[in-house]
């Protein structure tokens, strides 16, 4: 009799466990249910990293460097633009735009590929297009690094490396040193580009974040041209080395 009672108790427990498991397995297999973790959401951001007046030793300029992206944690579409417009003289200027697909390939690192368009305007008017491949990420010690390789519509090969670092004096007062190096494998005279290292720019900007999304800044910038690029600049009566004081805004949304 005691044995029968034990058997009944075990059968009752087993049926109860099966009853609990059934709805759980049904929940996991139910199509159309949301993911347990929201890792497929779409996010977006627009960042104007530099919008600045630059008091050069030659002609003063208005310059910008901005980017925007939309996508998830792994795949994103990036848009980038940068340029400079002279505020006096012939009102010469230049700008570029990039449209890139970005894929997360390692923690803090994205592989990027897409297209780039360049335009010179003013006394000279030229344009050209590129295919782009590169990376964006954080190097050791939290340096933001963006190396990229460009192949123009004429088969000209060039490269660019950007790097920056943020040093926090307080949660709102931030010093940002930056570096940009441009190089080319071929000479392209209409764009004033020689083969080898074209130019190096070093910058130092101090910003104060009134809000996280809005920060005025001041700083300095030093640019130097090299090799064939410097020779072309001299032949056009341009400076090969320039020191500038900058003031501008950084904002995002």
What are these language model-derived features?
Residues 70-72, 103, 137, 151, ...:
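Residue-level signature of outer-membrane beta-barrel architecture
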Residues 124, 128-188:
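Detector for outer-membrane/organellar transmembrane beta-barrel domains
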Residues 74-79, 107-111, 141-145, 170-175, ...:
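Repeated loop/turn-to-beta-strand initiation elements of outer-membrane beta-barrel proteins
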Residues 27-88, 102-103, 245:
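Outer-membrane beta-barrel initiation region
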Residues 42-44, 60-64, 91-95, 127-131, ...:
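Residues that define the transmembrane beta-barrel architecture of outer-membrane proteins
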Residues 66, 97-99, 133, 161-163, ...:
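Membrane-embedded beta-strands of outer-membrane beta-barrel proteins
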Residues 203-204, 208-209, 213, 239-253:
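Outer-membrane beta-barrel "beta-signal"
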Residues 50, 79-83, 113-117, 147-151, ...:
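Transmembrane beta-barrel strands of outer-membrane/channel proteins
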């Amino acid at each position: 009799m005691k044995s029968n009672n034990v058997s009944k108790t075990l059968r009752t427990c087993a049926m109860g466990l099966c009853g609990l498991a059934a709805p759980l397995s049904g929940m996991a297999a139910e199509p159309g249910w949301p993911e347990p973790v929201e890792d497929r959401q779409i996010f977006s951001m627009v960042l104007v990293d530099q919008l600045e007046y630059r008091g050069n030793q030659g002609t003063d300029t208005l310059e910008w460097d901005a980017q925007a992206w939309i996508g998830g944690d792994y795949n994103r579409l990036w848009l980038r633009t940068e340029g400079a417009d002279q505020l006096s003289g012939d009102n010469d200027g230049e700008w570029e735009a990039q449209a890139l697909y970005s894929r997360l390939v390692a923690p803090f690192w994205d592989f990027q590929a897409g297209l780039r368009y360049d335009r010179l305007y003013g006394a000279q008017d030229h344009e050209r297009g590129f295919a782009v491949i590169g990376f964006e990420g954080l190097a050791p010690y939290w340096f933001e690094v963006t190396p990229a390789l460009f192949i123009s519509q004429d088969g000209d090969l060039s490269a660019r490396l950007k790097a920056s670092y943020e040093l926090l004096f307080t949660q709102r007062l931030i010093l940002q040193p930056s570096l940009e190096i441009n190089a080319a494998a071929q000479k392209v005279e209409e764009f004033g580009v020689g083969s080898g290292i074209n130019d190096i720019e070093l910058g130092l900007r101090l910003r104060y974040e009134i809000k996280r999304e809005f920060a005025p800044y001041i700083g300095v910038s030093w640019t130097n041209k090299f090799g064939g690029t410097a020779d072309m600049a001299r032949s056009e009566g341009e400076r090969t080395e320039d020191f500038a004081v900058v003031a501008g805004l950084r904002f995002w949304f």
